[in-house]
Amino acid sequence: MTTNDSTPAAGSASPSAAASASVPAADSASTPAAASAAGSASAAASASRPAADPAPAPASAASAPASAAASVSADDRRAVTGKRRIAFAVYVADVGRLPGLQALLRSLALTNPALCEDVVVLHPGLPDTAFDAAHRLHPRLIPRTASGRHDAFRLDGYDTVIALTPAQVVLGGIDTLLRLRTGVAAVPGPGPDGVPDPRNGIPDDGILVIQRQDLDHREPPAAARDIPESLLVPLDSRYDFRALRLRDDLAVPEDVVVLNFADTPTSCTGPAQAARARHDLDDEAFRAAYLALPGAKHPDLLLHFALPFPEGSRPPIDLVRQLAEIHRGRGHHDLAVALLGKAVAGRPDLPRCHETLGVCLMALSRYEEAETHLLLATASLDFAPRAFGQLARLAWLLGRTEDARGYALAGLESDPTDANCRAWYARTSEMVAAGGTAPDTSPGEQLAHVALFAEGDENAGDKVLPEAVRSCFTADTGPDRWHQQHAHLLVDEAGLERLNARRAVIVGGGGLFLPDTAPNGNSGWQWNIPDDVLARITAPLAVFAVGYNVFDGQRYRRERFAASLRALVERSAFFGLRNHGSVARVRELLPAALREKVRYQPCPTTVARHLDPRLAGPAVREDTVLINCAYDRAGLRFGHDYGHFLAEMAAAIRAVSAAAEVRYAAHMPADERFVDDLRREHGLTLPVEPLYLLSNDAIRDLYRSTRLVIGMRGHAGMIPFGCGTPVISLVSHPKLAYFLADIDRPDWGVSVHERALGARLAERALAVLADHPAAVADVHDRQRALWSATRDNLTLLRELTGLPDPFGGPGRAPDPVVPAPRPASDRDRPSRHPGRAR
């Protein structure tokens, strides 16, 4: 079934109003509405001063390990994304309980080595030095003065609090506790035989899993027994198993997760006491036990327990490489190089380490050294393909296209199935073939364009975006009018000469302000340009619709980025960022004199109907809803809530499928993990639209021909919105909430951490489908402000470029209208790849 867009009846409610009319208000800390409001507030504040960071998270300073570099910060935007903050809370009444606290911390690390959340130690006023030993056992320990254990109900800054006691030790995995989302979970108090009995209420010395949004914050419980019965969630006794039950030397049941020694005489002996004694270790023995554990380990814990290496020791080379990979993942490439440089000195027989060292040196822009170590890594047949792929990338970064092609070919000779080498071979072969083709236009008549130019199976959004940027300046978006400079290529003297030969240099759009995608030591963000080269750009320089793309909780070092940012703003004649959230964040990093140069320039994909006459007419729509999810940096996106997210999405899809066919829009192959997980875990199969295989026109046609897009990627919302299609954002990154705040539609977003995600998403989606003309009209109305801001900025930019207005004059182009329905037989079928069932 297909439909045409049509004009809604006067007085029709917008989808935002319709969708939210019956949605009950939730705790403000976790709702997307509050998140977007926070984005709006920061945007408004940034008009006259830099927006301030929210109050420091409880872990920010007090819990940082002494070895942490002061320049490293975790970007905390939980108020925007709704990401859950989890903490353990332990009340220590006196110094006599400190050994119990230490045993608890050791047991937690040894049984859950991949888990590291804040541990808030509540105490009545013990001296700071009392916690020195505990600090050595956990990198995120936060002592906090409290009047009693009940203060665990009052821990501001956290959504979920797991209250433990010094009388407990952890014997198993606690993932189930982390996944709890409602009420206060506890094991009922024990009866005379020690077995939990619901009639005995909740003991004050047992485990509690507290969801703080369910509590009355004005009057939280004064003790466990005061928890309202309606909030209680019973836990199986294995999560708080009483050692008193193990009389006559009974063994501890194998499934016990938390063993509680409350009221157990210290003179007792037996298997339970032996289980606890296993965690009475000195620091050296404990560190050795943790490092010897198999499987995944949390990066914070591994760094905390492994470093510094004991003086005179020779740490295992695999451990050194693991630590270097952690530093690399956090952008601390200098620390990784320092570790690996010592380890591989005089050791050409360590290919994996040489590969990692080469990649880290490349991230520091120490390209000659990087090439040497990567070549050493190619000596191993096992690592040669990966090393050759990195060498191809390195040579490409330096403009050595023939060398890059040769390295990629060598990698394919080592392993003909290596996808990375095959992609580099295809890219560089095309570049070599096109190298002799010169545009008809002289350089002085061209614009230089610095951006990410996706190829092959890369992100579909990064394919559409550069063309949209160019459409703002010229009707011809091809190589005759534009000189393409990939942002990741090093701008050397020859590159600088090419840029300066152009009429102007346009940088953007996209999330270029991101430290860990193609890191380099020259700028600290995605444009690989040294400060001294940037200072010698003489062509007019415009930063256009760029985004501050740092993830919630992402750690990075700001100094190099901030210095490059200041140089960029100083040099730019125009500096426009794609949302007010980015404007506020970037202004925070600038001196006062430069802040007002930062202005708002929406992403041009959001105004596609005004840029492309082909999109200005009526849209003919199928009865489909498209969903998109993203999986890069999944830990930062989902935290502990991925299973919850998947289950809630399954419920929403079942509900929405009653009104429309639900299909999946993959912007890149990795996005298809969602349909695989959905089928495996919940038995649902979705047809897949592989957007990464489509042309830009086909991508826009697909998004224009559906009735609703539910997207997690930024451009899975902005591209359909720009084509006039209603959207709902799955908020896992601040940029989605920032965009919704800009268009004053915060309720078009639902956090991936939302407890009632499935119900909220289904309700909002069905409201859009029920009154689709009103939803489309609301999208068109929201676009007007974005187009007005874009037109005003383009007027300024025409003064820089000297180019004519591609839209026919200084006045605003007329808004596209929503026409009356037309027969389905008249519609122009979009060209697209047929959906694939997964």
Residue positions per predicted region:
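A glycosyltransferase accessory/donor-loop signature
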Residues: 76-90, 97-103, 115, 121-123, ...
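GT-A fold catalytic core of metal-dependent nucleotide-sugar glycosyltransferases
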Residues: 145-192
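Structural marker of alpha-solenoid helical repeat scaffolds
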Residues: 312, 346, 380-381, 414
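Register position in tetratricopeptide repeats
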Residues: 329, 363-364, 397-398, 427-431
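Active-site anion-handling motifs in enzyme catalytic cores
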Residues: 426-838
